[in-house]
Amino acid sequence: DYEATISPIPCTQQLSMYKAMGALGFDAGTLGNHEFNYGLPFLNQVLGGGLDVDGVDPTKKCAGAGYPAVLANVYSSKTKKPLVQPYTLLERTVVAKGTDGKEVKLPIKIGVIGFTTPGIMNWDKRYLEGKVYTEGAVESATKYVPELRAKGADIVVALLHGGLDSAAYSPTMENPGLHLSKVAGIDAMVMGHQHGVFPDTAATPSFNLPGVDHKAGTVNGVPAVMASSWGKALGVVQLALQWDGAKWVVNKAASKSELRNIQSKNAAGANVYVEPDATIAALIETQHQAAIKYVKTPIG
């Protein structure tokens, strides 16, 4: 809010959140509903430009996120094309051990595709109506996941700003993760929006739904995570990969996921927290203190 409306950042400056994510080495990300809260011109600015919609200059070049922002199910009403790139294909190197026990280095292509909740059309109607429209996550995935595979993706990771709901599927449903996991070709899901936890190790876990396995950390056999909210946890998906001599194959039965919380308890029962990263704190300290000063402003 502060960097969007109170003290708007210039085109040449990254959002503080993007600075932190850059320091952490994010490879890709998607958009949640709150990214649309400040209108499309501001979104265009903080993403670095390129949004071809009415009322926005797509040629405007700004600092941007610093990593590929992907979103497959929001389209420009003007162009009938995705508002931003629906997916990205990351080329990395895997260091593994061969059958002889020796270390080998092999290339791997990782497809990352993003989806947000169609609720943006209601919550930010004043900014979005007539300028963009949404598609169901399942429909978008069915369209674009095969494209990623055709371009050589060894694995496909779905970034879903949505969660789990056992209701019958609808293209407008807010939390379609249970249904998205059934789309062929998706190897892992990173979920959000509901501010819940998955997998949940509690005695009575949340998301106690058909097809959901908290012990394995899978949704319909697909490894998945939902890391609470506000940085309270880190979601970790561990995919078991096997090289068949020509390509990588995901062994889903041997894959798993987990959450690593920033807060735990020591032997005495006192709260223990992960140590803050001084590098990141220094990157955003000026804006952080300015925001604190603003929220302490008396209003009456």
Spans of features found by a protein language model:
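Acidic, metal/ion-coordinating pockets
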Residues: 1-259
